[in-house]
Amino acid sequence: APQEPVYPGDDATPEQMAKYAAELRRYINRLTRPRY
């Protein structure tokens, strides 16, 4: 199973938050992709 990205924290930089958001979207896409 894909690793869940780690939340960088409330004091994270905008760059860290953007990276986390992108990784989280990829993670969710992997989880919800149908298994054919």
From Swiss-Prot:
Compartments reported by the entry: Secreted
GO biological process terms on file: feeding behavior; neuropeptide signaling pathway
Modified residue annotations for Tyrosine amide: 36
Gene Ontology cellular component annotations, sorted alphabetically: extracellular space
Predominant subcellular localization, coarse grouping: secreted
Top-level taxonomic group: Eukaryota
Pfam families in UniProt: Hormone_3
Keyword tags: Amidation, Hormone, Secreted
InterPro entries associated with the record: Pancreatic_hormone-like, Pancreatic_hormone-like_CS
GO MF annotation terms: neuropeptide hormone activity; neuropeptide Y receptor binding
Family per similarity comment: Belongs to the NPY family.
Function of the molecule: Hormone secreted by pancreatic cells that acts as a regulator of pancreatic and gastrointestinal functions probably by signaling through the G protein-coupled receptor NPY4R2.
UniProt name for this protein: Pancreatic polypeptide
